[in-house]
Amino acid sequence: MADRTEQILTPSQLNTLARDLLEGSFPLVWVEAELGNVTRPASGHLYFTLKDARAQIRCAMFKPKSTWLKFQPREGLRVLARGRLTLYEARGDYQLVLDHMEEAGEGALRRAFEELRARLAAEGVFDAERKQPLPAHVRRLAVITSPSGAAVRDVLSVLARRFPLLEVDILPSLVQGDSAAAQITSLLQRADASGRYDVILITRGGGSLEDLWAFNDERLARAIAAAHTPVVSAVGHETDVSLSDFAADVRAPTPSVAAELLVPDQRELVARVRRAQARLSQLQQHTLGQAMQHADRLALRLRARSPQARLQLLQRRQEDAARHLRARMQHILERLQARVQRAQAGVQSHSPQRHLAPLQQRLRAAHPQAAMQRRLQQDHLHLRGLVRSLEAVSPLATVARGYAIVTRQADGSVVRSAAELTQGDRLRAQLADGSVTVVVDTSETG
């Protein structure tokens, strides 16, 4: 009879303890084996066994994970699976619940790839700081690839269509097999050392991980990272990733895309050149028009400031001044002539002849000779007095005695005092036999 002091478990309790023990002891395991008893019910989950020659274990891969498998599971296929051990408590069966599964050969390569990638990344081989930009204009390109593969045909076709002037050297190499990595590395190092190329393109078409394994070589990755010439890697399809992609300065998803990255489209270049020419022509016309306008303004200013222009201006001013002077002189002369005529008329009105005739008539009327003689003498004396009085006030008499009538040349006004004058005034002096023009040097009063 059982000892009642020991713990008594139910089947569910025992299975729970066993499940906890399994899950705690085996958090994550990798198993390589063959598939057996593969079933996929309507739920989308995948059930099978992993087996070898001596044992097997039940496995489950639920729909969220099984949907992403890259192969079709089938009987006898050797796989590499990763999962957690657990126990299905309802039946007491222990099983492996998988979250990843791949074909066995590719899985080993994948693990080696991930380990090498992590190590090179830790060393800084893939650091973005050391990557070089592609040159703006690629003139000479080296293409390391198989000379008979689809990749080289795609690259050359795109280059010929987009930019046929590019110089392209095909450096033929194996792209698959044991010696491919060493050959690609050697060609890369020689092309880089030559200094002949602006860019080096390493490329091949798609394939399995094993087919592309040459591009996961450590020596090749380090050679790409150390190259002084920018390196473009275009290996496989868009979903394929290799260490050469990580090490290269630029990674292209396909060979065709790599060719498009390296050269511009000649049609786009022609269009850009034409647009640039049009802008340059407009700029030239605008600049030339502004320059011509500026030159015209300078020419006008130069002509305005030239000695000939200034001489013409002085000549015009001199002619204007001469016309003005002649007009003023004519005006002054006319005024003087009018004054002389008025003076002459006054003299004539007091002429002795005019007074003598009436006197003679009066004398003839008066027969007495003596009385007539006295009266004649008296009248003659009176007449002479009148003549002297007229001559004393006559301007002509004043001028005849050596004096001059002085007027301003500017307006013809008569100068009556030295105080009216300033240095530099231009005057006209009317003399008995003509006139002279004088300039005031100094003036004194008193």
Curated annotation (Swiss-Prot):
GO biological process: DNA catabolic process
Family in the record: Belongs to the XseA family.
Matches recorded under PANTHER family: EXODEOXYRIBONUCLEASE 7 LARGE SUBUNIT
Pfam families: Exonuc_VII_L (PF02601), tRNA_anti_2 (PF13742)
Protein name, as recorded: Exodeoxyribonuclease 7 large subunit
CDD domains associated with the record: ExoVII_LU_OBF
Catalytic activity entry: Exonucleolytic cleavage in either 5'- to 3'- or 3'- to 5'-direction to yield nucleoside 5'-phosphates
EC number assigned by the record: 3.1.11.6
Keyword Chloroplast found: no
GO molecular function: exodeoxyribonuclease VII activity; nucleic acid binding
Chief localization: cytoplasm
Subunit field text: Heterooligomer composed of large and small subunits.
NCBIfam families registered for this protein in UniProt: xseA
Keywords, sorted A to Z: Cytoplasm, Exonuclease, Hydrolase, Nuclease
Originating organism: Xanthomonas campestris pv. campestris (strain ATCC 33913 / DSM 3586 / NCPPB 528 / LMG 568 / P 25)
Any one of the GO CC terms: exodeoxyribonuclease VII complex
Gene from which this protein is expressed: xseA
Function: Bidirectionally degrades single-stranded DNA into large acid-insoluble oligonucleotides, which are then degraded further into small acid-soluble oligonucleotides.
